[in-house]
């Protein structure tokens, strides 16, 4: 465990050094008066009057919530299933991490295909497709009885595809719709909605996991994704 953390920390420092060496130096600029935080927040919220930006905010909420659900609860589900099957905690934890690895690898290979699609379609349509994949990926997990069963991995492949699709759709939509005059405030609010999604997914998901079961967490995210899809259809047509 310690070795893993040291390796990750070393990779972060190495990446930081490469970025520091490779970034082009900026040109001198004149300092201008900073707007108060309240005005920046107000500008970000006011931008949600544009239904396309509101859709991007909602998608960010889901996409970041997806991330924490997959990273935390898929892992936890695999670990608890392993312990219930009689594995020792270390081996069960490894099984749980394997589920997360499957979702991550699936997303890694799927993302280039999703990027090609998003470049060729209307961004609203692309977001609807992405959120539909997210809804399907999370809801299909409901049919899994044992996450460690030999054939269960395919459902976690779909889960990884859905999770990365939601993230890609939200990011591409806000990059197009954020107005130049208030781009910083709008992108900041977009990320704030994402942070709220992380908190929501952690808090509510944890309670559902304990009180109902692992499936409930994924069904919750899938159902919320369906709501975003319906809103996207309204915005598009």
Regions found by a protein language model. Give the residues of each.
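C-terminal membrane-cytosol helix-exit motif in multi-pass small-molecule transporters
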Residues: 10-29, 231-236
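Interfacial helix-cap and linker-helix signal at transmembrane-aqueous boundaries
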Residues: 79, 117-118, 204-213
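Intracellular juxtamembrane helix-capping segments at the cytosolic ends
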Residues: 165-178
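Juxtamembrane intracellular "pre-TM" segments in multi-pass secondary transporters
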Residues: 25-58
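A late C-terminal transmembrane helix in Major Facilitator Superfamily
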Residues: 177-210
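Helix-to-loop junctions at the C-terminal end of transmembrane segments
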Residues: 109-123, 209-210
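C-terminal ends and interior cores of transmembrane alpha-helices
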Residues: 132-146
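Pair of pore-lining "gating" transmembrane helices in MFS-fold secondary transporters
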Residues: 52-70, 157
């Amino acid at each position: 465990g310690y070795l893993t953390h040291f390796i990750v920390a070393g990779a972060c420092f190495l990446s930081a050094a490469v970025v520091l060496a490779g970034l082009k130096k900026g040109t001198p600029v004149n300092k201008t008066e900073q707007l108060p935080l309240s005005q920046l927040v107000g500008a970000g919220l006011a931008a949600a009057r544009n239904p396309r930006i509101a859709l991007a905010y909602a998608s960010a909420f889901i996409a970041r919530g997806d991330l924490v659900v997959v990273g935390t609860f898929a892992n936890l589900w695999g670990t608890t299933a392993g312990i219930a099957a009689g594995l020792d905690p270390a081996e069960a934890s490894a099984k749980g991490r394997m589920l997360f690895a499957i979702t991550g690898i699936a997303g890694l290979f799927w993302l280039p295909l999703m990027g090609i699609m998003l470049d060729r379609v209307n961004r609203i349509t692309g977001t609807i497709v992405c959120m539909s994949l997210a809804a399907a990926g999370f809801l299909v997990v409901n049919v899994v009885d044992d996450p460690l069963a030999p054939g269960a991995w395919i459902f976690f492949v779909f889960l990884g595809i859905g999770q990365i699709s939601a993230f890609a759709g939200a990011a591409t939509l806000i990059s197009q719709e954020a107005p130049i005059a208030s781009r910083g405030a709008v992108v900041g609010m977009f990320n704030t909605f994402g942070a709220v999604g992380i908190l929501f997914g952690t808090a509510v998901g944890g309670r559902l996991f304990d009180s109902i079961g692992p499936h409930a967490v994924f069904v919750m995210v899938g159902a919320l994704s369906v709501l975003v899809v319906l809103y996207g259809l309204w915005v598009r047509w």
